[in-house]
Structures are given as C-alpha cells and as structure tokens.
C-alpha cells in the first residue's frame, strides 16, 4: 500500500468511526442465515456508488464494537486482513478496526 493509500485508508477509517460514534443506525439484522440471504445483501452493496461510505456502513450493518452472544469481531472474520486492518470482501473493501463487526461476518 502506498503512503497516499495509507493516508486515504486512515481518513476513511476515521470517518467511519465518527459516523458510528455519532449514532449511525445500521442494519445489523437480519443476519444472513444462508447463501441466498448473503447474496441479497451483496446485491444491495453492488448497486451503490463505490464511494458511498455511509450506505456501505448501513447496509453492511456495521457497529463499532463486538456483536452478538459470541461477541463476534472483524478480527475473526475470513475477510479481515490483519496487517492492513482491511475488509477484503469486494463489495465492501474498506478499512476496519479489529473490534468492529458487520452482518457479512463469516468464519
């Protein structure tokens, strides 16, 4: 990642954290229980402008803390790139904090 991209990612991460801290309401439910439900959420995300960060957060169901009975976190998700603090799900492709969560979480 170039220095410019790292700065962009840091700024995006800051904006995301600020939106959630300010009470952004996101769609944490329903959690997709099967591949069809998961694909529907992906379709919603694909329909967005790739730069529509707020709607990515809303549709993705992001929260800035562990979620659910098992306290799931981005850190345990298969899409989380540890060394970049990045969600590698192509429809999201955003920086994330390890302790955050979204409803596209998968192990």
Task: Go through each PLM region and give its residues.
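Cysteine-centered metal-binding/redox modules
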Residues: 1-107
């Amino acid at each position: 990642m170039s220095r410019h991209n790292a700065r962009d990612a840091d700024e995006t991460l800051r904006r995301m954290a600020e939106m959630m801290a300010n009470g952004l309401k996101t769609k944490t439910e329903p959690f997709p229980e099967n591949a069809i439900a998961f694909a529907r959420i992906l379709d919603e995300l694909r329909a967005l402008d790739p730069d529509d960060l707020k709607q990515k957060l809303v549709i993705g169901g992001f929260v800035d803390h562990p979620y659910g009975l098992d306290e799931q976190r981005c850190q345990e998700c298969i899409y989380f790139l540890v060394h970049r603090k990045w969600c590698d799900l192509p429809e999201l492709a955003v920086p994330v904090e390890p302790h955050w969560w979204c409803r596209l979480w998968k192990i």
